[in-house]
Design a protein with these regions (language model features):
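Acidic, serine/threonine- and proline-rich low-complexity intrinsically disordered segments
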Residues: 1-11
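Conserved N-terminal beta1-alpha1 strand-loop-helix module at the mouth
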Residues: 9-122, 127-136
Length: 137
């Protein structure tokens, strides 16, 4: 599990982590932009190391429920700040008000995409869209 730190700088003070949209391994940007790296771990440091070691190949990272539960909104923010697009795979499914608020938080920290269950119905799905849009503004 991720330990508590005062800031993201403290969390990563011993790590060198620089993301470049230019690939050193000559992976074309149009390919890199279509690939997502699934960060299916429960530790933000491990996720960051994994993304850092593979940044030449992926333009998007997927933050799932496991990592988001362990590290919270920082699990999205640290990767958007590093230049990745973030797909937040939280599978939102609740009352529309709750889904709206959750999607707004995820959007405010930079997630480009978030999943929501269609079985939640039209009102809930619209709430997810509106929340993500509001958070991104």
């Amino acid at each position: 599990m991720t330990e508590k730190y005062e800031s993201l700088d403290e969390l990563f003070e011993d790590e060198e982590f620089e993301i470049s949209k230019e690939s050193e391994d000559n992976v074309p940007l149009e390919v890199k932009s279509r690939l997502a790296l699934a960060l299916d771990v429960d530790d933000l440091i491990d996720a960051r190391r994994l993304a850092g070691s593979l940044f030449d190949f992926f333009g998007t990272v997927k933050v799932g429920l496991e990592l988001y539960t362990a590290a919270g909104p920082d699990s999205v923010g640290v990767f958007t700040e590093a230049g990745f697009d973030v797909f937040c795979d939280l599978k939102l499914h609740d009352i529309p008000t709750t889904v709206h608020k959750a999607a707004r938080v995820v959007g405010s920290v930079g997630a480009r995409w978030v999943t929501a269950h269609a079985s939640g119905g039209e009102e809930m799905l619209k709430a997810a869209v509106d929340g993500l849009r509001e958070g991104a503004e």
